[in-house]
Structure formats: structure tokens, C-alpha cells
């Protein structure tokens, strides 16, 4: 299981099959889980990765398995390592073949192959929501690669492969196990987990690293594998936070010069507050907008350096966001007792719906800040 909120599943050569916890959160029965896994097993047994990729690519993919099992957290990182096709899909014909094999495996194993059709509706709704959200947030959508996401529910070919699988049923009663599966989801992390850090409004919390930082209000924040990145609402401002572990304590200015290799520091000054010492200066550097004057801020806590950088796109006004970036850096602090709940990720709680249960009422009670009802 990949610790990612994205809704996806994929197979690697050698029979390694992965499903994200984000996918688990939207399934409603053991049979639906079997449908997703059956589809991915179909890719393995049909050797789609071998048929589509070169021997060199396949070798690289197999080599990533160790990396995957020892620290890869998200589907986006895996995409960069193993290639787009494995995570995003193999094309219409291969996806349909994986569905055919998956439905047959389900029936032979005692699961109702019709659950594959149930998954289609779930994932189509999820894909529509994800595309809408990605457009509003100015990013690429993360969607499941299978035929579930590319075919409408009444697609004749998919209906045919599921129908053909029914002949392999092992008995009159097929396993679905809705209640048992849903009960097992109680307490599952939903969205970001505290092990990777949690975004609440414009503030980022990280429980295990014991810190919080408020980014400029209105900026879009993205928690990546090795850094936290924020972009101004207009897309013309950039800020990021990284950390580096040191062998010994250093002065922040010395760290900039010796470890970051920054030369030509301008407008340098010390920063103190919240139990931290630091240093800030301007130096030319690479940004998403090209080479620009970059605000560098280093905060030292014991033998850990917290590195904050920021820049603006406009060459005529390169310091447009400078005050906001510095003000944001000054909010960096250790977690306080009142931060405990905010620093913990959300978890699924299973309730039994009644005649009067409404999505809007549940959404009002949920701790989700955005898109509560849609999710």
C-alpha cells in the first residue's frame, strides 16, 4: 500500500502490485478491491510492461522496487522513476485486456465480477472531481489509469468482458463482503498523513519534525517528497522550505557560504525569534521563473538547518514578495500543545446512514477545509 492520498493502483514487472490508501478510501466492498487488484494482476500476467517498454526501461523499473519499499511516498515520485505508462496506463487495448483477465480472476476466485462495473462509477466521479480541483489549483490531475476512468459506465466492450467472466463463477453466491471491508477502513488516514506533514489553511504542520510554518495568505501550498513549495495566487511568486541535517552546529551565515555555496550575499542580516537563530540575505539563483534575485533564509535548530528561499517572476519588481517571504519565515516555530490536533492528519470514521442523512450535513461536521461535500 502506497502512503499517498491520490486515487491510483499500478503493477510493476515481477508481480509487484501497489494500491494507494487514497484508492482504498473510495472502495465500498472487498469485491471492489478485488476488481482493482484483478485489473493490475491482468497487466502482470499479460506482460504489458514488458511488451510496451524497452529492456533498458524494464531493468530500471525492476531496480526501483527496493526504493519503493523503503521510502517512496507518492504516485508522482513513482511516475518519475518508473515511467508514465506503468502509473498512468498502457493504452485502450491493454487496459481492456487487463479488465477481461481481472474479471475472470474475480469469478474464479469467488468474487462477483459485476463489482468491476461498480468501481467504474466510483472512479468516474472521483476523476471528475479531481480534474475540477486540479484546474482550480493550476496543476495536473492525479487520476487512475485503468479503463475504469476512460470508459463510460455503459461501454459495450467493458460490459462484454465482465459478462463473459460470469461463466467462470464458482457458485450461485458470489463474495462481496461490504460490511466487513468498510469496517476495516475505520481509522484509515484520509488526505495527508502526519508522517508527511499536514496543511491547514496557509499553515504547514509536521508532527514528527516538530515545527509549523505559516505561508503567505492566499498562496497555493504543495507538500512534496523533500520540500514544501508555495506559489502566489497569480503564479508570479515562489517560496519553498527544505531541511538539511548537519554533522555539527554552524552559524547560519557560514552555512550559506560553505554548504549552500552562495556568493555575493547582499542585504544580509541576522534573524532571531521563537527559540531560533538565523540569517537572511539576497543572492542570485535559479527559480521557476529563471535566474532571479533570491531571498535566502536559513534558520538553525541544533544540528538541523531549515532553508527558506523565495523569489518573484517580474524582473522589473524582483522584490515584490520579499516582505511576505520574510514575514512567513518568522512564523517558523516548534509545535505548541494547542497544535497537537492540527498537526495530525484526518482519519476515516464509519457511520451508518439513515433516511435523514445528507451529504451536506456530514460535510459540515467534517474537518475538511475545502471540497468537503465533494470528497
Stretches found by the model and what they are:
Residues 340-371, 375:
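Primarily a LysM-type cell-wall glycan-binding module
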Residues 18, 305-309:
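Short hydrophobic beta-strand segments that form the core of ligand-binding sensory/regulatory domains
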Residues 199-215, 280-283, 343-346, 350, ...:
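Extracytoplasmic/periplasm-facing segments of secreted or lipoprotein envelope proteins
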Residues 1-175, 183-186, 190-206, 212-215, ...:
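A Zn2+-metalloprotease active-site environment signal
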Residues 34, 168, 221, 308-345:
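Surface-exposed amphipathic alpha-helical segments
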Residues 214-228, 301, 329, 333-336, ...:
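K/E-rich alpha-helical interaction surfaces of small helical-bundle regulatory domains
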Residues 231-243, 346-355:
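Short, surface-exposed polybasic-and-hydrophobic patches located at secondary-structure transitions
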Residues 240-242, 256-306:
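Signature of long, low-cysteine stretches enriched in small and polar/charged residues
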Amino acid at each position: 500500500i502506497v502512503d499517498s492520498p491520490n486515487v491510483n493502483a499500478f503493477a510493476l514487472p515481477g508481480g509487484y502490485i501497489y494500491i494507494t490508501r487514497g484508492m482504498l478510501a473510495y472502495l465500498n466492498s472487498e469485491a471492489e478491491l478485488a476488481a482493482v487488484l484483478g485489473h493490475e494482476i491482468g497487466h502482470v500476467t499479460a506482460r504489458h510492461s514488458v511488451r510496451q517498454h524497452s529492456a533498458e526501461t524494464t531493468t530500471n523499473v525492476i531496480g526501483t522496487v527496493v526504493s519503493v519499499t523503503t521510502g517512496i511516498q507518492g504516485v508522482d515520485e513513482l511516475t518519475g522513476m518508473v515511467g508514465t505508462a506503468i502509473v498512468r496506463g498502457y493504452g485502450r487495448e491493454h487496459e481492456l485486456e487487463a479488465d477481461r483477465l481481472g474479471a475472470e480472476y474475480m469469478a474464479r476466485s469467488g468474487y462477483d465480477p459485476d463489482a468491476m462495473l461498480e468501481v467504474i462509477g466510483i472512479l468516474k466521479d472521483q476523476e471528475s472531481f479531481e480534474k475540477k480541483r486540479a484546474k482550480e489549483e493550476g496543476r495536473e490531475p492525479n487520476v487512475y489509469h485503468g479503463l475504469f476512468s476512460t470508459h463510460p459506465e455503459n461501454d459495450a466492450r467493458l460490459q462484454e468482458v465482465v459478462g463473459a467472466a460470469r461463466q467462470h463463477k464458482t457458485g450461485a453466491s458470489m463474495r462481496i463482503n461490504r460490511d466487513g471491508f468498510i469496517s476495516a477502513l475505520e481509522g484509515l488516514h484520509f488526505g495527508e498523513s502526519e508522517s508527511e506533514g499536514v496543511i491547514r489553511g496557509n499553515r504547514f504542520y509536521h508532527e514528527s519534525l516538530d515545527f509549523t510554518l505559516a505561508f503567505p495568505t492566499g498562496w497555493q501550498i504543495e507538500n512534496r517528497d523533500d520540500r514544501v513549495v508555495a506559489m502566489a495566487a497569480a503564479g508570479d511568486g515562489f517560496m519553498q522550505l527544505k531541511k538539511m541535517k548537519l554533522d555539527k552546529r554552524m552559524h547560519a551565515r557560514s552555512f550559506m557560504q560553505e554548504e549552500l555555496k552562495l556568493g555575493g550575499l547582499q542585504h544580509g542580516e541576522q534573524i532571531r525569534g521563537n527559540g531560533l537563530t538565523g540569517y537572511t540575505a539576497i543572492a542570485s539563483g535559479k527559480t521557476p521563473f529563471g535566474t532571479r534575485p533570491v531571498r535566502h533564509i536559513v534558520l538553525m535548530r541544533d544540528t538541523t538547518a531549515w532553508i527558506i528561499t523565495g523569489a518573484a517572476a517580474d524582473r522589473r519588481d524582483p522584490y515584490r514578495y520579499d516582505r511576505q517571504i520574510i514575514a512567513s519565515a518568522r512564523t517558523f516555530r516548534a509545535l505548541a500543545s494547542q497544535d497537537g490536533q492540527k498537526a495530525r492528519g484526518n482519519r476515516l470514521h464509519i457511520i451508518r446512514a439513515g433516511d435523514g442523512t445528507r451529504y451536506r450535513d456530514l460535510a459540515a461536521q467534517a474537518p475538511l477545509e475545502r471540497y468537503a461535500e465533494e470528497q
